[in-house]
Amino acid sequence: MADTQTPNLQNTAEGDANTSAENERSLTVRANHQSQNTRSWLRYPFLVAGIALFLGPFSFFWPREGPIDSKDYVERTKRVLKTTPLIDGHNDLPWQLRIELHNRIYDGRVDLSKKLLGHTDIQRMRQGMVGGQFWSVYVDCDTQQQHFEDPSWVVRDTLEQIDVTRRFVNEHPEHLQYCDTPACAREAFKSGRISSMIGIEGGHQVGGSIGAIRQMFNLGARYITLTHNCDNAFGTSASTVAAGGADQGLFKLGYDAVKEMNRLGMMVDLSHVSHQTMRDVLGVTRAPVIFSHSGAYAVEPHLRHAPDDVLRLVKQNGGIVMAVFVNRFLNMKNPDQATIHDVVDHILHIAEVCGWECVGIGSDFSGTPFVPVGLEDVSKFPDLIQLLMERGATDQQIRLLAGENILRVWGKIEQRAKELQAGGEKPIEAEYEGRNWHKGMKNSPWMLRRSRDEALVNGAADQPFMFNVDSEGKHNPVVKQV
């Protein structure tokens, strides 16, 4: 048999008794300890209060985030631009992509996230604390078209510019976000991205067509400059007047264009237009207007700027004038001597006449070879803000200037469009006088006798008409020898 040890029942009973006693003592100790802890916690607030009273006089030694010195313009600027998006109303980078790369952005020749020549790249936008950017999809107008009958290449090129803008924005999702609403622009800023919007720089880019305006809106454009440096079907440009031409203001189709843009929620941009065109638009628009890159005529009498009477109308309208950075607009006699101080002068004058609620920033970077000293590229926006602070601008005024104004104006334009559409307003059906509707007309049946007669009057008599309507309203085939 194996040698085993039988447990001692007496020892086991005594052990159980000892264990029970120890457990009781342990419970008593824990209960007393918990009671003491409870009393300690009850006394804790009074202890903290006592310590705070004792150390209060010495608290200035502790590091903490407090009010910034009003003359610490660098820190004030950082604080403002970290919480309010700085939105630039006009940048022509897409034009550079067109001219230099023929819109080929995938072949490795350019990386927009790294520093490039010129004024604009994402690296310097980040340095400049840019929070939003309206990209201009500009296409030039090189003739004063009198009949506006050959716009096909301009409209085509505009479509290509919208395309390349959307593509380069999509290529950098960590930095850029395409937006077509002010709500999107705010959300992009909160997420750390630069909101990217599209503006069309000239009514010639829609070929004088209100239908094309609607389609550009559907493609994502959110403002149209009524004219660029040439007259178009909508109105007179500042360049025409500067060259000695008559200021005829807004043309008949221009009134319809403004009305339709109001209905759509497309911002009407009055940069580049003549002074009378500015006044005419402000007299008929049903929504706020913008000047995406202009200045104050009273500061520098260039026709690209808004006179004081127009600034007062903009105030009544609830619109915005975004200050431009182009040398020759800032100092006509000595463009090379233009500086950042000239831009500040324009901003402060606009604010004085129109109010801080209607001033913004519209640089025109990458659209001009010559910019003022101190504003050499997109990294320099904070320097402008600091100088404005030095000249007396408050943080709240800077917030309005930087981005709150354009977002508010844009929001009002959106709201007005919703009201007009909810009221049953239909899309405008209008065209410029002299429009030829019968180029390349196909052999096709006519719905109305009137249409056939109009075609004959308009010089389409050599076209075959497949059907006619007789006096009894019956459709009879008409075979015309050709």
UniProtKB/Swiss-Prot annotation:
Instruction: List the InterPro entries hit by this protein, alphabetically.
Output: Metal_Hydrolase, Pept_M19
Which molecular-function annotations from GO does this UniProt entry contain?
Answer: metal ion binding; metallodipeptidase activity
Lineage, top-rank taxon, reads Eukaryota
Cofactor(s) required, per the database record: Zn(2+)
Q: Which cysteines in this chain are paired by disulphide bridges?
A: C141-C230
Sequence positions that bind substrate: H228, R304, D364
Q: Which GO terms describe its cellular component?
A: membrane
| Compositionally skewed regions (Polar residues) per UniProt | 1-21
Asked if the keyword Transferase belongs to this entry, the reply reads: no
One Pfam family hit: Peptidase_M19
Tell me where in or outside the cell this protein is found.
Answer: Membrane
Annotated transmembrane regions: 41-61
Q: What class of enzyme is it?
A: hydrolase
In the record, the note on similarity to other proteins reads: Belongs to the metallo-dependent hydrolases superfamily. Peptidase M19 family.
Q: What does this protein do?
A: Hydrolyzes a wide range of dipeptides.
PANTHER family documented for this protein: DIPEPTIDASE (PTHR10443:SF12), MICROSOMAL DIPEPTIDASE (PTHR10443)
- Protein name, UniProt field: Putative dipeptidase NECHADRAFT_87110
